[in-house]
């Protein structure tokens, strides 16, 4: 199981703990009266000590498995990428394959260590804190309790409505982190971990390939082609490219360079979420068999593919909301979730049926609860 999936499980398990703690104060929320709300709040807050320990124990138990998954996807799989690329390079150069270089293993060790440090510091350690102001799970629990009490005591909602709505609001948002990007966007646990893991693994594999090219003193490569591509990749996908910039004495002016198409930047070639790969190319030896797609059509298809990704995220989110709704006993929301899930799945089916380059990827629509 991928590190991203393990963090999704972690978040959903923690939400389950919060919901169970709330139910533990008054199992039948339908019986809770407005005048009992202040007393209910006090009883709910008293449970925070036990809830804190429960969350900490669970995170401690899961952390080694997550750390191993991160190590495997970066170091173990990255090593396989390097070995395979070296084999391909040796074949086209008619050489004996070289073992993975020290530079490559150091690169893999560095990326694995950096990734786990970022995840551990920004996610795991915060969930291990006994400080209610720093632990995101406890902050969410307190927020649900306090906002629900306020909504009831001011006459805005019934106890059941207030509790149901506040739980659902947080499930939609996800457990928070303290991270805020340049645009002011606050990262959730799931969003942050998925982005870090996806971005780092793709970057690692591409850097491993680039290092192999250096190890074999090669500067040309074939860039894979896809029917759907981002703006930066569409003009050069499927072509032979330079992996060095214009100023390098080994630069071959017959071919474009990835540096002219945003290489090294998030939105550029081989940037964040870019699925393109580089393959060895030797002039006079290698035959480029990549299919060539119209540039504008590939960009348009890329936008359509992003719509599929959006629908898939919505299916996952509604499934998470459904799980929480069923756990707390919110039957109306659970029914609404079922309807929304079917609606987005229908949109995915239609999109896939109308576009031959798309395929249905059920794993992208599922959460661990639905598997």
Curated annotation (Swiss-Prot):
Query: What are the glycosylated positions?
Result: 124, 146
| Stored Pfam families | Phage_min_cap2
List, in alphabetical order, the Gene Ontology terms for molecular function in this entry. structural molecule activity
- State which residue ranges cross the membrane: none
> Where is the protein localized?
Virion
Residues making up the signal peptide according to the UniProt record: none
Q: List the disulfide bonds.
A: none
Keyword list (alphabetical) reads: Coiled coil, Glycoprotein, Virion
Q: Which InterPro entries match?
A: Phage_A118_VSP1 (IPR009319)
Q: Which residues form a coiled coil?
A: 336-367
Write down the superkingdom of origin: Viruses
Q: Name one GO cellular component term.
A: virion component
The primary site where this protein sits is: virion
Report the sequence similarity comment from the record: Belongs to the Lactobacillus delbrueckii bacteriophages ORF1 protein family.
- Record protein name field: Structural protein
Q: Which organism is it from?
A: Lactococcus phage LL-H
């Amino acid at each position: 199981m991928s590190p991203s999936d393990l963090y999704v499980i972690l978040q959903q398990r923690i939400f389950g703990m919060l919901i169970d703690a709330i139910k533990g104060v008054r199992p039948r929320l339908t019986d809770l009266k407005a005048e009992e709300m202040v007393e209910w709040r006090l009883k709910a807050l008293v449970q925070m000590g036990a809830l804190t320990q429960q969350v900490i124990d669970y995170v401690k138990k899961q952390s080694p498995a997550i750390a191993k998954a991160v190590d495997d996807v970066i170091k173990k799989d990255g090593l396989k990428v390097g070995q395979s690329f070296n084999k391909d390079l040796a074949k086209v150069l008619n050489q004996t394959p070289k073992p993975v270089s020290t530079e490559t293993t150091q690169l893999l060790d560095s990326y694995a260590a950096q990734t786990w440090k970022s995840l551990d510091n920004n996610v795991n350690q915060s969930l291990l804190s006994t400080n209610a102001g720093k632990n995101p799970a406890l902050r969410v629990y307190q927020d649900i309790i306090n906002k629900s009490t306020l909504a009831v005591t001011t006459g805005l909602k019934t106890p059941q409505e207030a509790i149901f709505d506040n739980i659902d609001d947080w499930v939609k948002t996800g457990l928070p982190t303290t991270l805020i990007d340049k645009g002011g966007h606050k990262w959730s646990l799931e969003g942050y971990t998925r982005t870090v893991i996806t971005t780092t693994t793709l970057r690692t594999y591409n850097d491993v390939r680039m290092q192999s090219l250096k190890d074999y003193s090669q500067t040309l490569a074939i860039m894979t082609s896809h029917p759907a591509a981002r703006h930066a990749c569409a003009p050069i996908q499927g072509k032979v490219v330079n992996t060095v910039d214009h100023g390098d004495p080994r630069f071959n002016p017959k071919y474009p360079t990835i540096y002219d198409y945003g290489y090294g930047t998030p939105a550029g070639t081989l940037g964040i979420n870019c699925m393109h790969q580089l393959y060895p190319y030797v002039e006079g030896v290698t035959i480029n068999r990549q299919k060539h797609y119209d540039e504008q059509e590939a960009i348009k298809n890329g936008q359509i593919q992003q719509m599929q990704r959006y629908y898939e995220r919505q299916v996952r989110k509604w499934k998470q909301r459904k799980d929480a709704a069923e756990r707390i006993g919110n039957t109306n929301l659970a029914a609404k979730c079922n309807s929304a899930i079917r609606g987005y799945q229908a949109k995915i089916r239609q999109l896939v049926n109308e576009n031959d380059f798309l395929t249905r990827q059920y794993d992208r629509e599922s959460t661990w609860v639905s598997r």
